[in-house]
Amino acid sequence: MCLWPLIQSAQASKPVPVETQHEDMIHDAQLDYYGKRLATCSSDRTIRIFNVIKGEAKGEPVILKGHTAAVWQVSWAHPSFGSILASCSYDGRVFIWKEVGQGQGKGSGGELQDGWERIKEHTLHTASVNSIAWAPYDLGPILACASSDGKVSVLSFQNDGSIEVNIFPAHGTGANAISWAPSVLSTVSGVSRSQQPSNSLAPQKRFVTAGSDNLIRIWGFDEEQKKWTEEETIKGHEDWVRDVAWAPNIGLPGMYIASASQDRTVLIHSRPSPSSSWTSAPLLPSLPQSQDPHFPDAVWRVSWSLAGNVLAVSCGDGKVSLWKEGVGKGWECVSDFSS
């Protein structure tokens, strides 16, 4: 695999190869909050953690074992909660790993795992857990999980070490991906935060899920009833939705969600204010030749930049493209490269 540093214009510079030493296909790679560590996971059932120095992975990786099937995804918690990593697998389990110091960590069976310890195990799903995501840090240590059993589970970690679990059906034919909304949304377009209504700035628990039913669904937490309720169902795709990503909206008006599908399209769902409806528009990878919204192959992953103004799209043909919204021109591809 490679690391691709980006310059300010959203152009990718030369790739930095990473020899992961995985023995099978790599499914995910995630940098931590500071960009100092890289976690990867693979069908070889392992997780590997590298130190990143000046944009390059250095030294031998820490290898975390315990899953009994392919590991689909890893997710770093905010550093305010410690050095914590979550992983999910085809084996139907979610593991929470914590760095506890060299020589102190013990995994299942008591083996040392290079200073990392598996501190929690979530086993309530009955099929593959395909996606995991930590909530914005100001909501607390909360992890959401999406599974092929059609359910979503939300794990809230308590101060006494216990976990409060809320699990509910989300997509009848399987949930493939999950992404949290910013906890404080820019609710009034063009109005500064100091002028926003006070109740609009309260932290809000909300996320979006993608399913094998070709739909994406938006869920919000009802504080009075203490349960998750469906707020919106958004149609548009004609096949499984493989991934979904809610854009950070730091300094940006409105809300954006990107979804990627087996139907070879990427849709941008936008909502300028809470009083308006969601609208959807496809990316057009064939411009200027045509208005065809189809990529060459199924689209597997979408990911926003930290500022929420650049979208990365990973296609099954092995290429990654970067997209920005032009002024009055829709979304434009500003860079692409082979992975």
Swiss-Prot record:
Q: What is the protein's quaternary organization?
A: The COPII coat is composed of at least 5 proteins: the SEC23/24 complex, the SEC13/31 complex, and the protein SAR1. Component of the nuclear pore complex (NPC). NPC constitutes the exclusive means of nucleocytoplasmic transport. NPCs allow the passive diffusion of ions and small molecules and the active, nuclear transport receptor-mediated bidirectional transport of macromolecules such as proteins, RNAs, ribonucleoparticles (RNPs), and ribosomal subunits across the nuclear envelope. Due to its 8-fold rotational symmetry, all subunits are present with 8 copies or multiples thereof.
Q: Name one Pfam family in it.
A: WD40
The ranges of the WD repeats are 21-60, 66-107, 124-165, 170-229, 236-279, 294-333
**Membrane topology recorded in Swiss-Prot or TrEMBL:** Peripheral membrane protein
Q: Which domain of life is it from?
A: Eukaryota
- Summary of the function given for this chain in its UniProt record: Component of the coat protein complex II (COPII) which promotes the formation of transport vesicles from the endoplasmic reticulum (ER). The coat has two main functions, the physical deformation of the endoplasmic reticulum membrane into vesicles and the selection of cargo molecules. It also functions as a component of the nuclear pore complex (NPC). NPC components, collectively referred to as nucleoporins (NUPs), can play the role of both NPC structural components and of docking or interaction partners for transiently associated nuclear transport factors.
Citing just one GO molecular function, the answer is: structural molecule activity
Per UniProt, the keywords (alphabetical) are: Cytoplasmic vesicle, Endoplasmic reticulum, ER-Golgi transport, Membrane, mRNA transport, Nuclear pore complex, Nucleus, Protein transport, Repeat, Translocation, Transport, WD repeat
Gene3D superfamilies given in the database record: YVTN repeat-like/Quinoprotein amine dehydrogenase
Write out the GO biological process terms.
COPII-coated vesicle budding; mRNA transport; positive regulation of TOR signaling; protein exit from endoplasmic reticulum; protein import into nucleus
Q: Where does this protein reside within or beyond the cell?
A: Cytoplasmic vesicle, COPII-coated vesicle membrane; Endoplasmic reticulum membrane; Nucleus, Nuclear pore complex
The protein's name? Protein transport protein SEC13
Q: Which GO terms describe its cellular component?
A: COPII vesicle coat; endoplasmic reticulum membrane; nuclear pore outer ring
Q: Which PROSITE patterns match?
A: WD_REPEATS_2, WD_REPEATS_REGION
Q: Which family does it belong to?
A: Belongs to the WD repeat SEC13 family.
Q: Main localization of the protein?
A: membrane
Name of encoding gene: SEC13
